[in-house]
């Protein structure tokens, strides 16, 4: 009698296990995507800070404008730039926004900061 009442229960357990495995896989994919986006944001911040520091070292140009240009070319937005003429370092903060995560709806954004020091002899 107990065999009849439990008939088909393995199918339900397997379906639930497949759903859990699918959600876990989607979560792992989302974490991977966030890590890649963070890496892109950090690279963009590094490039923008180096461009601003180069302008500070050479004294030819606008460091903030070059930092903005490099940030934009790397698909980020310049949030902050501490790179005044005459300074010995450039500190740049950029923001990268992205969508397309599987478990998190809407847009997310990541900030990255980089510092480049002007080292003149």
Predicted segment positions?
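Short amphipathic secondary-structure patches
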Residues: 49-98
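Alpha-helical assembly-interface signal, strongest on the long, hydrophobic N-terminal helix that forms
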Residues: 1-64
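Short, structured secondary-structure boundary patches
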Residues: 27-28, 90-106
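Arginine residue identity/basic-tract feature
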Residues: 7, 33, 38, 69, ...
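A general secondary-structure boundary signal
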Residues: 41, 89, 109-110
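Residue-level preference for non-acidic, small/hydrophobic
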Residues: 45-46, 71, 114
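Low-complexity, S/T/G/P-rich flexible repeat/linker segments used as non-globular hinges
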Residues: 101-121
């Amino acid at each position: 009698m107990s065999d009849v009442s439990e008939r088909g229960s393995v199918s339900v357990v397997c379906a639930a296990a497949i759903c859990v495995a699918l959600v876990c896989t989607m979560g792992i994919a989302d974490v991977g995507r966030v890590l890649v986006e963070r890496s892109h944001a950090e690279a963009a911040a590094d490039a923008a800070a180096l461009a601003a520091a180069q302008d500070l070292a050479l004294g030819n140009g606008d460091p903030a404008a070059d930092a903005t240009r490099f940030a934009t070319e790397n698909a980020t937005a310049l949030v902050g730039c501490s790179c005044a003429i005459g300074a010995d370092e450039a500190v740049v903060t950029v923001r990268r926004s992205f969508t397309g995560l599987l478990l998190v709806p809407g847009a997310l954004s990541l900030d990255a900061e980089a510092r480049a020091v002007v080292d003149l002899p």
